[in-house]
């Protein structure tokens, strides 16, 4: 029986899963919005949100913890310089999951994962 077992395996071994979420969370912090499957998005939330909570207090110790989990110097820098101060007053819920249809190849349900309160990109269309 698998009662009270949390987390999805996603047809990967543990090292592959760990590397995948490490890369996905670094991409999320860099681009502030990524597209993935719904199952991966729900699992990514559990990886990314504690890192943002950690970044709310900037210290050498917290930076080292974040780097040990992300292994991406640029992502850790942005996490502590931009994202931590941005969510200083928010007690949680930094990630939003928006369902966006199905993937054409295998009909997998897809979703956008975005950071809440991210700056909106202005459209580049010229208004005539």
UniProtKB/Swiss-Prot annotation:
GO terms for biological process: translation. Keywords: Ribonucleoprotein, Ribosomal protein. PROSITE patterns: RIBOSOMAL_L17. The keyword Oxidoreductase does not apply. One of its GO terms (molecular function) is structural constituent of ribosome. The keyword Ribonucleoprotein applies. It comes from the Bacteria. InterPro entries: Ribosomal_bL17 (IPR000456), Ribosomal_bL17_CS (IPR047859), Ribosomal_bL17_sf (IPR036373). Coiled coil: none annotated. GO terms for cellular component: cytosolic large ribosomal subunit. Pfam families: Ribosomal_L17. Belongs to the bacterial ribosomal protein bL17 family. Part of the 50S ribosomal subunit. Contacts protein L32. NCBIfam families: L17. This is Large ribosomal subunit protein bL17.
